From Swiss-Prot:
Pfam families: DUF440
InterPro entries in the cross-refs: dsDNA_mimic_put, Put_dsDNA_mimic_sf
Record's protein name: Putative double-stranded DNA mimic protein KPN78578_21580
Highest taxon listed in the record's lineage: Bacteria
Membership in a protein family: Belongs to the putative dsDNA mimic protein family.
Purpose: May act as a double-stranded DNA (dsDNA) mimic. Probably regulates the activity of a dsDNA-binding protein.
Length: 109
């Protein structure tokens, strides 16, 4: 895969794209009770955090997860406003290179 460092999504664009994908697919992949909980609590305790891809993605995908081009976005709820997300609804692996639309999601079970 040939990728260009100058053609990447910004961190904000990456977070926004991951969250949009999450919202689009959540109804098909989460329990209805989880969707209700997320929607009720997101305003106060919800968030999306950007990370380098964790090593356990290698169990799910078969390409090099160079952190220059791939990001992991964790979407969920924290115990407090501004706290660390500890109630995870989805982990989204996203390619930040604009010409390579790769996305993989691990949903809450």
């Amino acid at each position: 895969m040939d990728m260009d460092l100058n053609n990447r999504l910004t961190e904000d664009e990456t977070l926004e794209q991951a969250y949009d994908i999450f919202l689009e697919l959540a109804a098909d992949n989460l329990d209805p009770a989880d969707i209700i909980l997320f929607n009720l609590q997101f305003e106060e305790r919800g968030g999306a955090e950007l990370f380098d891809p964790s090593a356990d993605w290698e169990e799910h995908v078969d390409y090099d997860l160079n952190p220059d081009f791939f990001a992991e976005v964790v979407i969920g709820l924290a115990d407090t406003d501004g706290g660390e997300i500890n109630d995870i609804f989805a982990r989204v692996l996203l390619c930040r290179e604009k010409d390579h639309k790769l996305c993989h999601i691990l949903w809450r079970e």
